[in-house]
Curated annotation (Swiss-Prot):
Keywords: Aminoacyl-tRNA synthetase, ATP-binding, Cytoplasm, Ligase, Nucleotide-binding, Protein biosynthesis. Its main location: cytoplasm. It is found in: Cytoplasm. NCBIfam families: aspS_bact (TIGR00459), PRK00476.1 (NF001750). Residues 199-202 are annotated as: Aspartate. CDD domains: AspRS_core, EcAspRS_like_N. Pfam families: GAD, tRNA-synt_2, tRNA_anti-codon. This is Aspartate--tRNA(Asp/Asn) ligase. GO terms for molecular function: aspartate-tRNA ligase activity; aspartate-tRNA(Asn) ligase activity; ATP binding; nucleic acid binding. One of its GO terms (cellular component) is cytoplasm. It catalyses: tRNA(Asx) + L-aspartate + ATP = L-aspartyl-tRNA(Asx) + AMP + diphosphate. GO terms for biological process: aspartyl-tRNA aminoacylation.
Length: 604
């Protein structure tokens, strides 16, 4: 017999009745029924019920053990009585009568209870993550992550992609988020950077003549954390040679749709080949965001024209200085009280906006300050244009175009949630396409890149030389699912002269481009194919499939929201010698002192 087990804790069934078996695992739960002790023995695979009565040598040992102690049990498999069968367990038709028990490890007082769904503070869960990972939900999430990655690998290989590995110690890049830097011992005063993405390397693989690359790539970004962000994360990084934007879509849609269908647990998924293509400008108008949740049926409309010379002072003033007025319908709100609408306005102000105007309507009668100021006839024109009914309310977001779009987008989400309009049980994908190549930076008073500076502009050199930069679109695209951006990608700018021209428009001279991006530019001067790709985030994919609120619930050992590893104590100080070896010293940041109601740096 094996030293620890003949079967795992999910393997036994009625066909094993009469056998003598050996099981090992954690003491998940105990129930004392007056001289008979029932123990749920748990391992990675499942749970088996162990029975120890007064005739069993295992009874006094098991009785004294604390939960989560690790034991090896020898015993006989017996069928449960009909009334004792547990249909929720694979082993629910049998139980093992313990003959003997060997203690492998005694558990002390537990910081959190494994067999309970009780919630615990995140700092406790992260400090004792190895215990938290024993809990069913989190254990299941990590297994789901493994299965998703395996499925992705198989599907990418089937699509003709080859898996590569790219360097972890790389050069620092001037664009994007902050780098995590690593000092060099052999080259004093110089630093490596952990890659924010394998962007340069994967493009250079295309220049090297490989055709379809992918990897499950670790990425590192020193940025502020959110529920859907982590300083270290993984992405399905891929790149393809001699492709158009449509070729990229056709390659990755079957992978994403297939993975989601495989693990959706009954939820519907947008079919491959049917991902809607939504231009960026349309997304910002209709949804107020470039990450639209298409489960929400509400659509934003622009009614600016209705308030030009309208006599409604506030909106007329906003429109007069180039602002926009956007509206969000609130269907069938005739039974909602005035408080519902006022609460939405209060919510907008708490979110940092100036406020959210509204119109109420019940059986055709308009209500609210905007309807009063704009007049029922003018309001009816808006309702007719938008196809709204006699019991539909309307919320108004007004201001500079970006501000109005942002408020309208947030309000669309809020109204959809408050009215229960968000469709459940589905994953709705879309592509956001036709991003602007450039934007005007109000703070710097100059034109700069809108998103990815290395995207190919639509129209290439002709567009750069002849069009208004703010009208030039890029071959850039995002994949969005249920309001989450899963990936950004682009057809790359592989032509040095077009790249120089694009950077020139954004205010960078040729010398700066050569200095900052020498590796890429020099490679492109030696023969580069047209190429493009993307990089869907693994953590966000698993988060959606697991129906979790943040990505820390699908990462085995995540950092907390302060980028700390509470379990291992990272980041930590290192011995002075370790700093001397890499030729660096630490300088404490200036302490902040309270002066009146403000914190100021103490630079003395």
């Amino acid at each position: 017999m094996h030293a620890y087990r003949t079967h795992n804790c999910a393997a036994l069934s009625k066909k094993n009745v009469g056998e003598t078996v050996r099981l090992s695992g954690w003491v998940h739960n105990k129930r004392d029924h007056g001289g008979v002790l029932f123990v749920d023995l748990r391992d990675h695979y499942g749970i088996t019920q162990i029975v120890a009565d007064e005739d069993s040598a295992a009874l006094p040992v098991l009785d004294k053990l604390k939960l989560e102690s690790v034991v090896t049990i020898d015993g006989d498999v017996k069928a449960r009585d009909a009334e004792a069968v547990n249909p929720n367990l694979p082993t629910g038709e049998i139980e093992v009568f313990a003959r003997s028990v060997e203690i492998q490890s005694r558990a002390e007082e537990l910081p959190l209870i494994v067999n309970s769904a009780e919630d615990y503070p995140e700092d406790v869960r992260l400090k004792y993550r190895f215990v938290d990972l024993r809990r069913e939900r989190l254990h299941r999430n990590i297994m789901l992550r493994s299965q998703v990655i395996t499925s992705i690998r198989n599907r990418m290989t089937a699509q003709g992609f080859t898996e590569f590995q790219t360097p972890i110690l790389a050069a620092s890049s001037p664009e994007g988020a902050r780098d995590y830097i690593v000092p060099s011992r052999l080259h004093p005063g110089t630093f490596y950077a952990l890659p924010q993405a394998p962007q340069m390397f994967k493009q250079l693989l295309m220049v090297a003549g490989f055709d379809r690359y992918f990897q499950i790539a670790p990425c590192f970004r020193d940025e502020d954390l959110r529920a859907d962000r982590s300083p270290e994360f993984y992405q399905l990084d891929f790149e393809m040679s001699f492709v158009t934007q449509e070729d990229v879509f056709q390659a990755i849609e079957p992978v994403l749709a297939g993975v989601f269908e495989e693990f959706a647990n009954g939820k519907s998924v947008t079919k491959s080949g049917e991902f809607p293509r939504i231009p960026y400008a349309e997304a910002m108008l209709k949804y107020g965001t470039d990450k639209p949740d298409l489960r929400n049926p509400l659509v934003i409309s622009d009614v600016t024209d209705h308030f030009q010379s309208s006599g409604f002072g506030l909106f007329e003033k906003i429109v007069g200085i180039g602002g926009r007025v956007r509206v969000i319908p609130a269907p069938n709100t005739q039974e909602k009280s005035r408080k519902f609408f006022d609460d939405m306005n209060d919510w907008a102000r708490k979110e940092g906006f100036a406020g959210l105007g509204y119109v109420t309507r019940k059986q055709g009668e308009f209500g609210g300050p905007i309807a009063k100021n704009h007049g029922p006839e003018n309001m009816q024109k808006i309702y007719d244009e938008l196809g709204l009914g006699e019991n539909d309310g309307l919320f108004f977001a007004a201001g500079k175009e970006k501000d109005a779009a942002k408020l309208a987008g947030a309000a669309r989400t809020r109204v959809g949630e408050e009215l229960g309009l968000i469709e459940q049980g589905c994953f709705k994908f879309c592509w956001i396409v036709d991003f602007p190549m450039f934007e005007y930076d109000e703070e710097l008073k100059k034109i700069d890149f809108s998103h990815n500076p290395f995207s190919m502009p639509q129209g290439e050199m002709e567009a750069l030389e002849n069009k208004d930069p703010l009208e030039i679109l890029a071959w850039q695209y995002d994949i969005v699912c249920n309001g989450y951006e899963l990936s950004s990608g682009a057809i790359r700018n592989h032509k040095p002269e077009i790249m120089y021209k694009a950077f020139e428009i954004a205010g960078y001279d040729r010398e700066t481009v050569d200095r900052e991006f020498s590796g890429m530019i020099e490679a492109f001067k030696l023969g580069a194919p047209p190429h493009g790709g993307s990089a869907p985030g693994i953590d966000r994919i698993v988060m959606l499939l697991a129906d979790e609120p943040n990505i820390r619930e699908v990462i085995a050992f995540p950092l907390n929201q302060k980028a700390q590893d509470l379990m291992m104590g990272a980041p930590s100080q290192v011995p002075p010698k370790a700093l001397r070896d890499v030729h660096i010293r630490t300088v404490e940041p200036p302490k902040k002192q309270q002066v009146g109601t403000h914190l100021v740096n103490d630079d003395s």
